[in-house]
Amino acid sequence: MPGARDALCHQALQLLAELCARGALEHDSCQDFIYHLRDRARPRLRDPDISVSLLTLVVTACGLALFGVSLFVSWKLCWVPWRERGLFSGSKDNNQEPLNYTDTETNEQENSEDFLDPPTPCPDSSMKISHTSPDIPLSTQPGGQENCAHAVRVQRQVTEPTPSARHNSIRRQLNLSNPDFNIQQLQRQEQLTGIGRIKPELYKQRSLDNDDGRRSNSKACGKLNFILKYDCDLEQLIVKIHKAVNLPAKDFSGTSDPYVKIYLLPDRKTKHQTKVHRKTLNPVFDEVFLFPVHYNDLEARKLHFSVYDFDRFSRHDLIGQVVVDHFFDLADFPRECILWKDIEYVTNDNVDLGELMFSLCYLPTAGRLTITIIKARNLKAMDITGASDPYVKVSLMCDGRRLKKRKTSTKRNTLNPVYNEAIVFDVPPESIDQIHLSIAVMDYDRVGHNEVIGVCQVGNEAERLGRDHWSEMLSYPRKPIAHWHSLMEKR
């Protein structure tokens, strides 16, 4: 049956071909028939054949990859250790050869002389390329000089292997015992051995220098120019403040209103101050100040300059300070000497004036505010003797006006006084938010006027700890709240 069907199909195709050739059928139908015959004549791959061919390619690629990996692993595991073992055994055999230390020393001296001095004709003796290689005889034929020059160049390019500790000790003994020991040779050896070494001390020094440079730049607040001179007849230290340059800007306008306070420490009673120069970063003062002091006492005294920025509506800003001591080490002193000093950056907190401890207690029903001055510590010395006579003055302030003031007793000749004295103010509850306390530690002076050692404030208008202490007192009425307060300079 299939054979008869194929025969019928073949006859039908022939019949259609004859009809197309005679033109009995349409041209388009004949073209479609011809294209159909061509498509049937092309060999077609079945889907199972395509999948089998792709699977064969994938399996072949995986096999090649596994073969490459196995070759690489076998090379790493077998070939590299075998080669290193062969090299190590060869070098070990070479190191076991006997060394002629006398010849080595002689040849080393010849090499050093040849390296430092101009080239000389080649000797007839043998030349050593290294400590472990045998002697190579040199030919003495007519072209010997050219061969020698070439050999010398080759010798200089060869790196000498590192000698053992025993070799170094024996060679050192030979060098010391040799009467012709050359210092230049030893220096050259040290230079050659030092090439390529890392010296941590050089990097450490450089880093320290860089740190010092950054530190000095970060603390620089300009420079102060002044003149010092001592008048032996009047026994006075003459200080002339000439000018300041490159001061930092403290105002929003990009300028400052600078002035300078001067002390001859440890005496803070004698204080001088320059005029305020408005809106400038390079003020010219040209003011002279006198400090009566004995010449022999200058060694224990320090000249202290404090540069401030004047502010009409708030506390003055401390720009920086300059401290001059060891007057006898200054050039041309006691004659006139001109000095330029960097103004060191300090904050108000860095000015160590001491601390004061007191407690606050408020009774709302009675309208009574009690401040108990307990003690102070590490106060700044205001007298030449290195001590002070401190007492505490408390002022009740409202809108910048002083309503009342009280003070404690004076403690003589101490920097750590203990008071335990209570001061009471009558303040009604409706006015407690409008007032604040100003506390000043004073130094009593029997002859002159009393000096302020330092001040602090508590209240809603105070800063940081002063405001926190006041808020804590109001939060816990009828309970004494004690804190230490750092003293600040009075503005």
UniProtKB/Swiss-Prot annotation:
Ca(2+) 3 binds at residues 311, 314, 317. Residues 105-116 have a biased composition (Acidic residues). Its cofactor is Ca(2+). Pfam families: C2. It is found in: Cytoplasmic vesicle, Secretory vesicle, Synaptic vesicle membrane. The chain crosses the membrane at residues 53-73. Ca(2+) 4 binds at residues 383, 389, 443, 445. One of its GO terms (molecular function) is identical protein binding. Ca(2+) 2 binds at residues 251, 309, 311, 317. Residues 220-341, 352-485 form the C2 domain. The cysteine motif mediates homo- or heterodimer formation via formation of disulfide bonds. This is Synaptotagmin-9. The gene is Syt9.
